[in-house]
Structures are given as C-alpha cells and as structure tokens.
Amino acid sequence: MTALSPCTLNATQELSLAYSMRLGMPQLALGGLSEAWLLMECGHRHWTLLERMLGVEARCMYDDRGCRMYASFVAVHESGASLAHFQEADEIVLESRIAALTSKRVLSSHFITGRGRVRIDMISAFVRKARPSDTDTEVLHGAEWDRPGIRPLCPLAEIDSSLPALDRQIRRGLDGDYMGLSLQPSGLSPAFVCRPCPAIDFNGVGLLYFARYIDFVDRAEWECMLAADGSRLATVERRIFYFANLSPGDSVKVELAGGPGSLGRMEHLSRISRVSDGRQMALVYTRKQCTRA
C-alpha cells in the first residue's frame, strides 16, 4: 500500500484473500468462536476486497454530487458448523472472495475452516448521507458513482450463494410466517428496549455498526427467553436483513417470536425497530444449539 498513491489501489490484485491464524481470547466467546468478532473481521475483509474491486480506497469514494459513499450491508447469512466447534489455540483458515451482483450491489463469501467449517455471505450496497449528521441514507445507482478513477461494477452471470434470493424474499414483505415463525403480536415475547452506546456501538462515520444488531437480539434473547442454562448456546445459523440505522441517543426495541425447542435447540425470528418513530431497522432469524448435554 505504501508504494501506491493515496487513493488508488493495484488493479492487478486478486479479488480474494486467505490467511491462517491461531484463535485466542479476542476471537472467542463462552459458546466457542465469537460471532461478533467473526462479523467484524468478515466485514473488514469485504471492504478491503471492495476497495480492490473499485480501484480506490474507501475514504476516497465520492459520488457525482461530491458526497461521501459508504458500503452499507443490506443482508448477511451465517451458516455451516456450530461456532462451538472452535476452541482456544485452534488453527483456522479464513478465505474470502467478492463479486458484483448488480451495478449497485456486491456479494462477498467467507469460509472459516478449522474443527468445523462456517460460511458467511454478505451483500452491500452503496449509500450516501444528504448531510454528514444524517443517519438515514439513500441507496446509490451505478451511474451516480461513475467517476474517473472508480471502476464500474461488472456483475457475474452466476453467483454461488443463496443470499440474494433470501434477501429478495424478505424485501417483498412478510405476509405470513418465515421459517415457521410469525411476528404477529400474539406470538411475540415482551419487547426488549435498550439505548446503544456511542462509544461502543457506532462506527467512525456515526452509523450504528452492522455487527451490533445481533448484540441487541442476543440481549433480548437472554433477558426474555433464557434461564441460566442458556449460557451455553452457540449460533448455528443467522440471517440478518438490514433496513435502517439510527442516531446516537435513540433507543432500539427488539421483539422476538419463537424460543427454546427440544434437544437443546433455540430458534427465533426478531424485529429490531427504532423507538423514536417505530421504523423497522432489521429482521433477524437465529438458530442455536446447546453446546453441552
């Protein structure tokens, strides 16, 4: 990077990353591999590969109006082995690749291999703020960042991922159940409300960090559904669909449908919304498994 000009990247670099590492406490949680760390790491790798794809550093991405462009996640799917399969001092390999879905959306896939194998797919779209202080953003079209120095997105004919179809299904609207779960008021747990902390939950541009959404879901699960024996649950699958952000000082409300099942399983569908205006911020489907008998 030091040999390159401040705002351009080497166009000959491969649009993939791979490295191995040894797991320590920063990468682990009580139930195995830390899901929060994993999302943050894969998110960072997504943005790194996106810079290579467009040929420009993220801090230098501006649209045709001169507004800063941000790669905002719209959907994330985590699947594969339980995170409980990963333990301290394990050697893992993390492989990532990226491809354009459309002229305005990008998909990255990340494979974490150790005692088990986990896959995380992530879709992002470019957004901008009307003013730097805004938290609501608007999605940009390809022509709006068609500027010298930024390479256009060239969609692939075939994508090896189920996430685009899952995302389209959600954005058509939930008229009934999803994965056998319904968010009708009669089936919801008591609402969990909390106020995100600016020093912990927001990123450097003032937006609620994408990886924090599941923190609120897990806190709601812990407060509303679990007894002490729920501390050994580990995630097996997570689907996150993002719709909106919020301002520092605002609060979030989490509503859950579902709950503990047989054989140590947990499955629920959650809706995250803003307390200030009731706007839906995200829908999250979660499936977990107890790590002990």
For each predicted feature, which ranges?
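Hydrophobic, proline/glycine-rich low-complexity stretches
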Residues: 1-93, 101, 217-221, 225, ...
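Non-catalytic linker/capping segments at the edges of enzyme domains
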Residues: 1-37, 104, 129-205, 265-267
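HotDog/MaoC-like acyl-thioester-processing domains
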Residues: 81-166, 246-248, 258-293
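Generic alpha-helix signal with a bias toward terminal, lower-confidence helices
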Residues: 50, 54, 131-138, 214, ...
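Intrinsically disordered, low-complexity regions enriched in small/polar residues
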Residues: 21, 72-75, 128, 180, ...
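Acidic/His-leaning functional-site neighborhoods
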Residues: 177-255, 261-269, 280
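Bulky hydrophobic/aromatic packing residues
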Residues: 62-64, 126, 143, 214
